[in-house]
Amino acid sequence: MPMYVVLSNFTEQGRTDIKNTSDRLDRLVPVAQKLGVKVLANAITMGQYDVVTVMEAADDATIAKVIGTVLSRGYVTTQTMRGFTVEEFRQVTQSI
């Protein structure tokens, strides 16, 4: 399944309720699973982004449903990128 990397930043609401971030990330897993998405990793980060999440989904529309659900809660803003494993990238670049 395609991999997606989601870069998140806390909104004012997310910063105000930062102590519950871990619980919200835990609740993301079953919500994503119900929509057919597997959460591979969540990391709280320092620097430009506050949270990095790696997920697998069947397609862009499926990941968009999860991201829309997350955004509707108002705690973060996101940027989503399609990621490739090293092996996927190797297959893409073999013909170059």
Which residue ranges define each predicted feature?
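Short, well-ordered beta-strand segments in beta-rich or mixed alpha/beta enzyme
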Residues: 5-9, 43-66
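Short S/T/G/P-rich N-terminal loop/turn motif that feeds into the first structured element of a domain
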Residues: 1-34, 38, 46-49, 84, ...
